[in-house]
């Protein structure tokens, strides 16, 4: 048996064994509130052998994914070895960028929806970065892990509770990382607030507020290509919080969710759905496809989450109404509060004035509480860009952890819990706002897991 045939045989054997084990995790249990039996051991705090060089495979290099081409081309110890996209135009753009950086030529794949499997079969890929339309996140991440790769997937991690359980089970069975790349957790402000929380500045935490408020009606004009070509349809199919993780991720880290506390249940309501139909009527001909859709997703969705420890979190979603951008980023404790957009702080003890008034001068707070990671890498992150540097810093940190044998900052349990707001909110809205339980994706490990530390 040749070396190539032997590798193919061993890989196929692993996939078959894994599929058999995963099938034993009853899908009916995954789809309900019942915690399925584990197919492997926990990956909480998973540390994998150090990699001298991290060989990166990229699936999807369009509107979002092209940024990863630039970031990984600039990070020491990372090398892009394979790129897949069904759109030859964006693939050519990625190839041009690689050439301009003077990096080694990666393999390129573009023939058909499943061309990514050719990338997964390569032996020169250690991690797979997935930046595709949402519906592909779950199958691609699962197949990547079954192929022996570590999966890094854009938000949300998956769209149903069953799919989220499937990724948890696959990660545990294969002992591979499956990180949902929540970039906002690497923003300067979010890192600073995490540092403040860990130093006890706000006292005992009580309540958080998170959001994705971002007017995106203009994406409806993207018909055949780009994000709006597939994302618009979600507003005609679901009524709930379609995109919860940008605001929720940082707040969950402040509260040590999955590491001392856990999301317990949520209740969700939506406003009327008016804005997208009105926009379509104004911007498109009467017989245009955008005017043939019935938009059911409320313009504003508000979900309230209760944690096992009794804390509350409000999560909002609005990509339709005309208003300024906001993620809220509010955290309230017994000693005071921080709120974002704009940044402001009020403390009973330790503040510069009365807690009855906001302190909006952040300079002194940055000077004292900037996260060590931002102090170390912030200048380079800002120079390399990506939402103010958070994208570059996230990619840098991923590579750093893999090269130095450290656990990642986000794991499959975080991605599952944060992404679960989407299907649970849809279920709650459809049930007159009645509460829906979060699965315990950690299977109890949250009770003993160590909080996310302050690393530099």
UniProtKB/Swiss-Prot annotation:
Keyword Hydrolase belongs to the record: yes
Amino acids binding substrate: 212, 231, 243-246, 325
Cofactor: NAD(+)
UniProt entry keywords in alphabetical sequence: Glycosidase, Hydrolase, NAD, Signal
PTM per Swiss-Prot/TrEMBL: Predicted to be exported by the Tat system. The position of the signal peptide cleavage has not been experimentally proven.
Leader peptide range in chain numbering: 1-33
UniProt keyword ATP-binding present: no
Cofactor info, note text: Binds 1 NAD(+) per subunit. The NAD(+) cannot dissociate.
Transmembrane segments annotated in the record for this chain: none
Broad class of enzyme this protein falls into: hydrolase
Its job: Glycosidase.
Similarity remark: Belongs to the Gfo/Idh/MocA family. Glycosyl hydrolase 109 subfamily.
Protein's recorded name: Glycosyl hydrolase family 109 protein 2
Organism: Shewanella sp. (strain MR-4)
Organism placement in taxonomy: Bacteria, Pseudomonadati, Pseudomonadota, Gammaproteobacteria, Alteromonadales
């Amino acid at each position: 048996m040749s070396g190539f045939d032997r590798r193919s045989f061993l890989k196929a054997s692993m996939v078959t064994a894994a599929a058999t084990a995963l099938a034993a995790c009853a899908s009916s249990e995954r789809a309900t509130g019942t915690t399925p039996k584990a197919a492997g051991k926990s990956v909480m705090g998973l540390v994998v052998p150090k990699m001298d060089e991290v060989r990166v495979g990229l699936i999807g290099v369009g509107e979002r994914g092209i940024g990863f081409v630039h970031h990984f081309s600039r990070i020491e110890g990372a090398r892009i070895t394979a790129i897949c996209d069904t759109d030859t135009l964006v693939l050519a753009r990625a190839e041009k960028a690689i050439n301009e950086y003077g990096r080694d030529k990666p393999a390129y794949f573009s023939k058909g929806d499943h061309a990514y499997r050719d990338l997964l079969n390569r032996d020169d890929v250690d991690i797979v970065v997935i930046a595709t339309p949402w519906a592909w996140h779950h199958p691609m991440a699962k197949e990547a892990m079954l192929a022996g790769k570590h999966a890094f997937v854009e938000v949300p991690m998956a769209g149903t509770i069953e799919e989220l359980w499937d990724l948890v089970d696959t990660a545990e069975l294969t002992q591979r990382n499956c990180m949902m790349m929540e970039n906002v957790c690497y923003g300067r402000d979010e890192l600073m607030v995490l540092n403040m929380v860990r130093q006890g500045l706000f006292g005992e935490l009580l309540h958080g507020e998170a959001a994705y408020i971002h007017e995106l009606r203009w994406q409806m004009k993207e018909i055949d290509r780009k994000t709006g070509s597939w994302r618009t349809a979600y507003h005609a199919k679901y009524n709930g919080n379609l995109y919860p993780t940008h605001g929720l991720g940082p707040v969950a880290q402040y509260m040590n969710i999955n590491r001392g506390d856990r999301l317990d249940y949520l209740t969700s309501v939506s406003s009327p759905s008016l804005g997208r139909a009105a926009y379509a009527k104004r911007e498109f001909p009467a017989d245009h496809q955008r005017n043939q859709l019935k938009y059911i997703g409320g313009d504003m969705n508000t979900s309230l989450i209760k944690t096992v420890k009794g804390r509350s979190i409000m999560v909002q979603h609005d990509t339709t109404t005309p208003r300024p951008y906001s993620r809220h980023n509010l955290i309230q404790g017994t000693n005071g509060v921080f709120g974002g957009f704009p940044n402001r702080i009020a403390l009973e003890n330790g503040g510069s004035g009365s807690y009855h008034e906001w302190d909006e001068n952040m300079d002194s707070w940055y000077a004292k509480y900037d996260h060590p990671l931002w102090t170390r890498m912030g200048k380079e992150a800002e120079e390399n860009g990506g939402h103010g540097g958070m994208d570059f810093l996230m990619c840098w940190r991923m590579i750093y952890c893999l090269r130095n044998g450290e656990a990642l900052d986000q794991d499959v349990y975080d991605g599952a819990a944060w992404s679960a707001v989407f299907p649970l909110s849809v279920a709650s809205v459809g049930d007159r706002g009645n509460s829906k339980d979060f699965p315990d994706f950690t299977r109890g490990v949250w009770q003993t897991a160590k909080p996310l530390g302050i690393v530099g």
